Amino acid sequence: PCACAEAMAAARATLVVGAKSSGLSAARLLRRLAERVFLTDDNGFPEQIPDGVEPVLPSDAAERLDDVQQIVVSPGIPAGHPLVHAALARGVRVRSELALAADHVHGRVIAVTGTNGKSTVTTLVADILAAAGRRAFAGGNLGTPLCDAVGGDYDDLVVEVSSFQLEWPHTLRPAIATVLNVSQDHLDRH
């Protein structure tokens, strides 16, 4: 059964769109899951690309949509991006890094969102939990992407979630969630 599962994973492929922190984190997780991973970014690639990840020039990325089952978009990639439109038109699943991570994390998820104060509250809650003797992860939009927490031994995952990360339907089902406040921000995107 193990060899069969590995063969099935190897047959799956994902195109990660965005080669910054969350995109690279998603690519690393997908490689750990033995998937084939393509990576593209309109702004170029970092010096270090995770092992086994295949860089794809933006001009060639749409051609890869025939080879993948899903694309994972970084928070900086707007829903109106041409590659996103092309994927949706072909029936390719579009998800966020947060959704990918949510399928694989273990532990109680606490989500923090809102216009202001997310980082402060995320850090504070994780510190309080750690002081109470719990193994707490603080991340998401704050510093460490949630995909990097997959496989970690955490009791609680306190996740800062930006409005950009909430654009895509996802499987994150927090045990606790809070919206700190809502005001007009990022109107160019929303």
Question: How would you describe each model-predicted region?
Answer:
Residues 1-96, 100:
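N-terminal leader/targeting and accessory segments in enzymes
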Residues 31, 63-64, 75-190:
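Phosphate-binding loop of NTP-binding sites
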